[in-house]
């Protein structure tokens, strides 16, 4: 599946560490969920960080500790401490650290909208549903508003990860 299959077009986003958040912000503005003046990576970074911070039980089991369970001298199960969790949330909010699955899920829930990540791998569309699991109302049938972004690994051959905004083609 590609953008053309979905009658969409791709718009490039600067691969600067904020690309995921910038792509989602753009789509939220296109869908009328955020005013264009507020559709910035800083706003979506803050939304993701705040959601994760206020819902630690939904995220802590999936976030590895700084040292990891296999790190030299590690004696714990590899989970973040409360202090590390706070540092992690602050980094998501205030730095250009890359976002991933936890941040996409947080954005989907914070804005109560499915987020589809289109990629070249399997599965071709990764659905993040605010309810937590894909269901019949996840936007795959085209009847519901959905944020669509495309994931590109090493798009420029430099090893970076980029997200591209997927917008409906306007006729």
What are the roles of these predicted feature ranges?
Residues 118-171:
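Structured partner-binding subdomains within large eukaryotic complex subunits
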Residues 1-127:
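Papain-like cysteine protease catalytic cores
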